[in-house]
């Protein structure tokens, strides 16, 4: 099975976008009502690799994986051998033995591509100098919850050029 990354918004199509948003809204309702959430990620480990500080991204990812039954491992360059010159290739190969997915928050988009190149597990972009696709999804969800569909009456998205191809 081919791994599916979420490095750029272009990694998902309209159908996937709608499915992700629908699932996120459903999970939010369950969480808000205090209802149990199916543990669909039980026995899955998420490696969260941070090169830059984060509050919302870290909390969101860590709570999400835990609520879905998985585990989060938080790493940064100061607590791994990356600080001593270990290559991304070596780090990726070691981590993929233990983790099922990586979330990387980096200063250089090219590092996301390196993690993709050297690992067999999916890569999620937690923010790079080029894009922040998870934030775009969160913004779309927030907009729709507060103002309705992101499409105007003519069917054209009102969010911006990056979303145009999705609708």
Predicted regions and their residues:
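Active-site cofactor/substrate anionic-group-binding motifs, chiefly glycine-
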Residues: 45-46, 50-98
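Positively charged, low-complexity intrinsically disordered leader regions
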Residues: 1-59, 63
